[in-house]
């Protein structure tokens, strides 16, 4: 006679307690491998200042390669980046090539306001825009020629008048009146016909710049090739001088400027630069690409990882590796525990029930056979 036994309860903790202990392993590893205090690295970039910039390569970086810049050490829109083995205050400004000169508070002239801000970032000193246009030069050395000697009012008037010479013109102080001199030589410039904004065709961009200087008005490149009316002009005067008479009118146009010798590429060059702007220069037969930040290469097809990303050092790489191992162990342990609970226990119950059912079935058959024999 087979005695009926109650089915054994699934002791999931007994089956999986070894795996559950593994869940404590990540916590133990994190406690043992806690980050070292940032004591070997400088707390500010002021300790890294050199005559040529900010360089922190002289500090011990073997223990930790993490560095945070504060607003007092990398100011004026600068960005602190780790490039190679150095931590430097980098001034990455995407300044265009437009010629809109400004005069800075340090007495220097800049191509446009963007270059002024870039210089302030590199020098880590404040540079303000004093006036539009190039900085004024001294009207005289003090010796005088009898005309302007001792006359501060006349000297100031002449200096302010010379300031309005724009578009590459220079002020000729030796002339009887104020003259703007255009010392632009286009004899060595290659032939590259262009259509300008004044509706005339020029042999190259240098002639457009020369015409803009002599007329003292803004003339831009509109398209490659000659204009539809094929009007060609050369604007070289005999003495290279241009007299300014409309001082008041042009004083309000100091923000206008002549562009550099780079012009946009024609439409059939669409897609020539993958991540940048296509430009055509008079000194090159083929167009060139001005890549966006983070890209390099002839067609801006390569990523500049040295700028966009910081290469982790050995200590940080060790932490990353430990974190990856911990994550893998956690996933494995969770999977094993889930499989243990959902499959191991129900399977044991099914096997036990099958054995019980088989025992009862055999007893019933034996009883029926004995009854028939009687």
Curated annotation (Swiss-Prot):
Residue ranges constituting the Kazal-like domain according to the UniProt record: 90-137, 181-229
Site feature (Reactive bond) residues: 97-98, 188-189
Domain of life assignment: Eukaryota
Chain spans, region Required for shedding: 303-320
Glycosylated residue positions: 55
Residue intervals annotated with topology Cytoplasmic: 342-374
An individual GO BP term: cell differentiation
Region of interest (Disordered), residue spans: 353-374
Family, as annotated: Belongs to the tomoregulin family.
Job of this protein: May be a survival factor for hippocampal and mesencephalic neurons. The shedded form may up-regulate cell proliferation.
Protein name listed in UniProt: Tomoregulin-2
Species, as recorded: Bos taurus (Bovine)
Native organism taxonomy: Eukaryota, Metazoa, Chordata, Craniata, Vertebrata
